[in-house]
Amino acid sequence: MASRHSAFYSPLLTCVRLLREDGHDAPYSVLAPGQQTYVLVRDGAVDIVQSAVSSNWKARERGVEPLPVHFAQINQRDGFFLAAREPDPAFEWKKLEGRTLLADQGDQPLAMLKYAVKHNGVDWARIKVLRKGEADYVHQQGPISSGEIVASVGASMPPVALSSLCCSRPYLKTGDPRVFVQTYGRAREWVRTAPAPEVAAAEAEFFPGVSQELLASTIQRYQDLGCWDGGIEIPRDLYEQALNVFQSVGGITWRHKYEEVVAAPPA
């Protein structure tokens, strides 16, 4: 299951495809409004979910237990972009001040955006942030079918432990995820290195109605950004950077220990 559906999660989509080609039962669905990943994992409704290490933090601060454990990295760069009505090759983040911005309200996308804004010397309070309607700039994940991309959030801030795969601790200990993890490692490396048009063609079934050209250009952007660089283990330093982001924008009350949220992928 995915908490969001996007080409940003191409390693997971390719893993699902490869598992199916190998004869495994590999259902794929997207989290519905009102559903919570930790509840679905806890109740055994799903085995493995695309989420983020940050999704554990607020729940932990509310005393929620048990929570999923994150065992494999998907992305180490934010995958959102800022789009404007017209091309602006001379765009600077300072241009956001005094303008309207339609921002994604998800906890992690918004935290990353606020951090990128601050990291680039912009006063968040001077931006008119909208939840709906039309704006001078739009903050969204790829593929982006309208507007002109003027900035990448991920390119405008340090690498960070972003999207990851999680499951229950008991399930991770069973050894059942081994085949999935082996296939996932192969899928992630292929998505990272294969020509973007080839990746787009292979995952076209997941994006009905999206042109191959748009999908390929989105994948190319993520490849160039280095979203899928590194191994599948969740690096401690990138986890700490994610904590830095959320702490900087007031998204967490305390720093959560790596071992309480992350585990190594099964060998």
Where are these predicted regions, by residue range?
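N-terminal hydrophobic or amphipathic helices and topogenic motifs
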Residues: M1-P27, G34-Q35, R42, D229-A267
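Short, glycine-/small- and polar/acidic-enriched structural segments
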Residues: M1-Q141, S146-P159
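Short, mixed-charge aromatic SLiMs
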Residues: Q35-T37, Y137, G209-V210, P265-A267
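Generic structural signal for individual residues within well-ordered alpha-helical segments
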Residues: Y38, E97, K128, R178-V181, ...
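Short flexible/disordered coil segments
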Residues: A59-E61, P89-L96, V210-R221, G251-A267
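Periplasmic-binding protein-like
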Residues: I74-A84, A151-K173, V181, Q220-D224, ...
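Pocket-lining segment of extracytoplasmic ligand-binding domains
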Residues: V129, D136-E205
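Secondary-structure end/capping motifs
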Residues: K173-T253
